[in-house]
């Protein structure tokens, strides 16, 4: 199943999308630095709640907060430096689950119903490659039910369930891939990736003040940049976006500046 993303920002003029008889549907992904503290959680929650109040069906995908994934890895290696990849995946998945619960509660404090979902509760099915699993499909029934009930599903990124019923993780940056997969199987109108930078640059703007931002960049050029060390998007997310024809928007989680369209 494929989906087509639509460009543009999250303006106040958004209205229910009548072109297919459904509300406009948006998937938004928030990275760990975008959720690192209560203030940042509230900023993201207000953006999500605002869209919901405009009649938009919005799904959030969240990463683990701050450096929590690194802390979980350190804890696991402390108890067993050679622990199994299966158990490591089970441990690491907890970081995103915590973020999802905190985000759902933060949205709820704004008077909007939200529900946190693990990757498997959201229907994400993967192969059995622990630590680097690939998404095979998304069973969207639960997500569709929650959207129909008027809730904001907050999905723990980076994780899924393999054919044996075990938890898997998608590798570093895997929450980007989660967002693209949900956008594809839910036939979302937009897939927005919120980060700590306001788009895709030809060089790291935190190191090079004269770095130039792309207004738009092709999938292939984006993959080339990733191959050269750019970390703004996970390579598998761009590959999946290209395969499923999902247009991505890379945006700052902290400013209203225009971002970069990928695709």
Predicted regions and their residues:
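Proteins with a high burden of low-complexity, intrinsically disordered sequence enriched in S/T/G/P/A and R
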Residues: 4, 23-25, 89, 251-254
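Residue-identity detector for glycine
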Residues: 3-9, 19-21
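Nucleotide/pyrophosphate-binding catalytic subdomain
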Residues: 14-239
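A conserved active-site cap/scaffold subdomain adjacent to cofactor or substrate pockets
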Residues: 226, 231-263
């Amino acid at each position: 199943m494929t989906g087509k993303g639509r460009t543009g920002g999250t303006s106040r003029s958004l209205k229910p999308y009548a072109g297919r008889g459904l509300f406009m549907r948006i998937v938004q992904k928030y990275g760990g630095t975008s959720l690192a503290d209560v203030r940042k959680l509230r900023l993201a929650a207000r953006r999500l709640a605002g869209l919901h109040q405009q009649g938009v069906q919005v799904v959030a995908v969240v990463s683990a907060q701050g450096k929590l994934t690194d802390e979980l890895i350190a804890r696991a290696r402390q108890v067993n430096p050679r622990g199994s990849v299966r158990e490591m995946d089970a441990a690491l998945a907890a970081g995103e689950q915590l973020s999802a619960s905190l985000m759902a509660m933060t949205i709820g404090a704004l008077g909007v119903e939200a529900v946190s979902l693990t990757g498997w509760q959201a229907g994400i099915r993967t192969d059995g490659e622990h630590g680097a699993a690939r998404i095979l499909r998304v069973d969207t029934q639960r997500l569709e039910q929650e959207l129909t009930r008027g809730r904001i599903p907050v999905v723990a990124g980076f994780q899924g369930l393999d054919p044996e019923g075990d938890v898997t993780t998608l590798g570093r940056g895997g929450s980007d891939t989660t967002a693209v997969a949900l956008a594809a199987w839910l036939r979302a109108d937009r897939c927005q990736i919120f980060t700590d930078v306001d788009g895709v640059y030809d060089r790291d703007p935190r190191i090079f003040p004269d770095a130039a931002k792309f207004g738009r960049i092709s999938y292939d050029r984006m993959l080339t940049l990733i191959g050269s060390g750019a970390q703004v998007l996970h390579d598998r997310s761009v590959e999946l976006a290209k395969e499923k024809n999902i247009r991505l928007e890379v945006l700052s989680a902290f400013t209203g500046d225009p971002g970069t369209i990928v695709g």
